[in-house]
Every structure is written in C-alpha cells, then in structure tokens.
A protein has these predicted regions:
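Active-site-adjacent pocket scaffolds in enzyme catalytic domains
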Residues: 1-82
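Aromatic- and carboxylate-enriched substrate-binding clefts and catalytic-loop regions
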Residues: 1-35, 89-100, 107-109, 130-156
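Beta-strand-rich recognition/accessory modules
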Residues: 62-77, 87-94, 272-276, 322, ...
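Well-ordered, non-membrane alpha-helical segments in soluble/globular domains
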Residues: 64-79, 105-126
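Surface beta-strand/loop "capping" patches
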Residues: 145-182
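Broad, structure-driven detector of short, well-ordered beta-strand segments within folded domains
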Residues: 177-184, 282-294, 348-350, 368-390
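Acidic-aromatic substrate-binding/catalytic surfaces of carbohydrate-active enzymes
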Residues: 179-278
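Acidic (Asp/Glu-rich), glycine- and aromatic
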Residues: 192-196, 275, 282-286, 294-344
Length: 416
C-alpha cells in the first residue's frame, strides 16, 4: 500500500507521503527495487523487478542464449515515466552480493547469475555514456529529490504490459492524500485506492496490534476484495459505472479501452478512448475522462455521450463505489461505519449493522461513508440534474458499503 517510487515519508505513517514541512520526517525514502507496475500488481512481486535475479526467478529469459530483453524493457519503461512527472524518472537496482556466491543458493547456475548482473550493470553504464542516465548516491539523490519535487506534486505512471503480449494498461497516481490505480482493461475503473489523507497511526512490531502487517489500508482492492467480478452477492470493491436501458445493464468494467495522459496546470488528466456499449435496440458511444487535481484529495470522473444510434434516447447512469477497509483478503469488522445522504441541511444517516439496508435521497448534494477504524471519510457528489444519491450497507457474506448516484443521460451530454 505504499508508493512505488521515492517519496518523503510523513512522521506519523511512513507509507504515506508528507503533505507539508510539518509532516516531513526528514528523510527521502526509496523503494527496495523498481518493479513492474502491472506484473507485480497482478502476480508475484519477486519475479518482475529491476534486479536481474528477479527476472531469472520469473524464468523470463531464453534458456539457450541466456538473454533477457524483458529486463532492459523494464528499465526503459521506467525511463519513459519522465513523460508523466515533469521530466523526472527514477530507476534502481538494489541487491546484496550474496546472490553471486557459488553455494547453490539460487535457482540458476552461478555463471548465469554473474552474467545477468554484469549485463544489467553494462546496460546502465551504456545509458550513462550516452548521456541518458545520471547515477547518484542515495544522499545525492535525496538532495536532488527535494530540489526537484514539491510536497504535493504527485507521482504518476501510465504503465503497459511488456511481458505477456496483452494490451493491458494501468494508471497509477500517488500524492500525500491517496494512492489510486485506474484499470483501462476495466473501462477506467478504480481498482485500488489507499486513503493517505488520514496519515493513519499504525504501530507495527512486537507488542502492537500489527506484529508484521505494515500495509496502508485500502478502500478498494480488487485482488483482495474481488473487484468487479465476484460471487452472486454483487460487486467486490471497485469504482465504476453502469448504464441501463430497457431492462438491460452494462458495467463499464466490461469495456476495455486505452488511456492518454495530459497535464493542465496542476491537474493530471487521463483521457480514455471511447467505448461502444450495445443494447438490444441502442448503441451508445461513451468517453471517460479521469482528472486528479493536485492537493485536492479528489478524483473527478466525467462521462461524455459522444453518439447514440437513437439521438432521442435516454439511458440511466449509475455511478458507484463499492468499498470497505483492510489490508488482507479477510474482511474486517464494519460495525461503527456510518453512511449518510445530504441535501442542504437535511442529513440522513445509517449505522452499519450488516442488514443489507439501503437509503436514497433525490437531488442529494453528497453521499458519504465515515470509517472511523481508519480515520477516513469517502464521499461522492455529482453535477447531474435530478440525480438520486444512495447508500447501501452489505451483509456478512458481502461485507461492503456502496455509495452512488442514479441519473439520466442523453446524447451529447456530459455528467461528472
């Protein structure tokens, strides 16, 4: 649940970046390795990093020629992240000498281990000679990082699959208030969300509640909480939208697409390619735009109807977030959570009791969940006219909470 690239840890929780000088712990932290932001998310983190032995352990090499182009492609994709971070990209190989011994400790022969190390270092060395890489000590880098980055400047990565031959794309965003992952294979759904805003005090070690678990809790985590596809009890944790027409329903999680990154002032923008949604008697071309305004602690999601086969048709749009909290695949106690709807001064609340209840409010200004266990509130609002806000509690077999808005949308309209 922490950053994938260097950050300034906050005093209260080292996984959450500091938002200002008062929260600054005084150090610059670096990740142990630079890992594949798709393969390590979907699979084993020890197989896909810029440590040659990781790549060998993942068996991502030619057994006859002992070549491993994936290692170089991984380094190059990290180099490309400068496009999303104001000209800055970071990469490292951090390993001890133990894996170069001849004691049979590793999965591959010593000769291959030695060759992979030398080849990896040579690749960095050649980049340096070409003027494409600057090598620094950790102390030098800490000074560079503080000079280069502001506290609230986010780290961004539009990452694509370079291993399995798919077109899958993820976008990662990290700042002092949240870490989010947008999955283009699921129509731009948010599939991982960590609410750093609380800078949660989370003691770890012997004599604490968390002997070994230092993870920052999630609100959404598709691997541990099933994501879009789960059992018959409904969605796992995900932030997505459904379109409904004449009794048919399509979730954007089923609409694969691609994204393009841009920046306007202090806002990072993800523009997704339009998707076609086919109902029995209607086809809708819809585009999604996801915006992250620096320092706002908010994510803006716009849906644009570009075209309809029947220009006079109207479809229902259900924007929703299914969330919970935790650090593992095992559910936590949801008692104590409060769900609410707000319209002007009218606030209606529902205390979570696993009773599968629902509550809605026409023209709601906001729907909200307060999760005291992780000192976090998550809310949703919309600019859609006549939208109905709703909240739902789950039950023991599906211990989630849902916030959402139902509205109508027509051809050429935009809802955010």
């Amino acid at each position: 649940g922490g950053p994938w690239a260097p950050w300034i840890p906050s005093k209260q929780n080292t996984h959450a970046p500091a938002a200002n000088e008062a929260e600054d712990s005084g150090v610059v932290a670096i990740p142990h390795l630079s890992r594949d932001l798709l393969a390590c998310y979907d699979g084993n983190g020890s197989n896909f990093g810029t440590h040659p032995q990781n790549v060998l352990r993942g068996m991502i090499y030619d057994t006859k020629t002992w070549e491993y182009p994936y290692l170089y492609n991984l380094i190059d994709q990290y180099r490309s992240l400068e496009k999303y971070n104001n000209g800055y990209a970071y990469n490292m190989m951090f390993v001890g000498p133990g894996w170069l011994n001849k004691m049979g400790r590793w999965e591959q022969p010593y000769e291959l281990l030695k060759k992979s190390y030398e080849d990896g270092m040579k690749y960095y060395g050649d980049l340096k000679k070409e003027g494409k890489l600057t090598d620094m000590t950790m102390a030098e880098f800490a000074d560079y990082y503080r000079q280069k980055k502001t506290y609230t400047e986010p780290e961004c990565a539009l990452w694509r699959d370079i291993l399995y031959g798919s077109d899958k794309q993820l976008f990662w965003y990290c700042d002092p208030f949240m870490r989010a992952c947008v999955n283009m294979d699921q129509g731009g759904a948010i599939v991982d969300l960590r609410p750093y805003a609380a800078k949660l005090e989370w003691p770890v070690g012997i004599g604490t509640k968390h002997v070994t678990d230092a993870s920052y809790p999630f609100l959404i985590q598709e691997k541990y909480r099933a994501g879009y596809f789960t059992h018959y009890a409904g969605e796992g944790t995900v932030r997505s939208a459904k379109l409904k027409h004449n009794g048919e329903e399509v979730d954007l999680c089923l609409c694969r697409t691609k994204a393009h990154f841009s920046q306007e002032g202090s806002t990072r923008i993800l523009t997704l390619d339009p998707v076609d949604i086919e109902f029995y008697d209607l086809t809708v071309k819809l585009q999604t735009i996801v915006s992250f305004e620096e320092g706002s602690s908010a994510i803006k999601i716009e849906r644009k109807i570009l075209e309809m086969s029947d220009p006079n048709a109207e479809v229902e749009l259900n924007e929703y977030i299914v969330a919970c909290y935790g650090t593992t695949e095992y559910s936590e106690d949801m008692m104590g959570i409060t769900l609410s709807t707000k319209k002007g001064d009218e606030v209606e609340t529902l205390d979570y009791e696993y009773k599968c209840r629902e509550m809605e409010k026409a023209d709601a200004d906001e729907v909200r969940a307060v999760i005291p266990q992780i000192e976090t509130a998550v809310s949703m609002s919309t600019n859609a006219e006549g939208a109905v806000g709703y909240v739902k509690e789950g039950y023991a077999f599906s211990p989630m909470l849902t916030l959402g808005y139902n509205s109508k949308i027509k051809d050429k309209e935009v809802v955010a």
